[in-house]
C-alpha cells in the first residue's frame, strides 16, 4: 500500500520461533524530524492473512512485551509478540490516522529468552 513500510522476515528450520516486532515513531523524534506520530503494526503470513494488529503496545500483551525487555519507549508505539511457524512473514507499519513520516520496524527472535 501507499504510505506504509513493509519489513519481511523468514522463520527457517522445522520448528517455530517466537518473535517480538516493534513499530517505532515518536521515540525517534529526538534525533529524526518528521516521525510517524501514531504507528500501527500489522503482521501478515505468506498468504497475506493478518495474524496480529497492534496500535498502542500497552493495549495488548503489555505484560508479556515488558517481560522481554523490548517494550517500546513511547506508549503510542506498537509491538507484537508472536509464535511463528517456519515460513515467510511481513510486518506492515503505518500511521493509525493516515499520517506520513519516518518509522522503524524491528524484528527480534526471542525464542528461549522468555
PLM region spans:
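A sequence-level detector for low-complexity, Ser/Thr- and acidic-rich stretches
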Residues: 1-114
Amino acid at each position: 500500500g501507499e504510505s506504509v513500510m513493509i519489513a519481511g522476515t523468514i522463520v527457517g528450520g522445522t520448528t517455530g520461533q517466537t518473535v517480538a516486532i516493534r513499530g517505532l515513531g515518536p521515540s525517534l523524534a529526538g534525533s529524526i524530524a518528521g516521525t510517524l506520530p501514531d504507528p500501527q503494526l500489522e503482521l501478515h503470513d505468506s498468504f497475506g492473512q493478518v495474524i496480529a494488529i497492534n496500535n498502542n503496545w500497552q493495549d495488548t500483551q503489555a505484560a508479556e512485551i515488558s517481560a522481554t525487555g523490548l517494550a517500546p519507549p513511547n506508549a503510542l508505539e506498537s509491538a507484537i509478540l508472536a509464535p511463528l511457524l517456519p515460513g515467510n512473514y511481513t510486518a506492515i507499519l503505518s500511521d493509525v490516522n493516515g499520517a506520513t513520516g519516518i518509522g522503524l520496524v524491528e524484528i527480534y527472535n526471542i525464542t528461549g529468552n522468555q
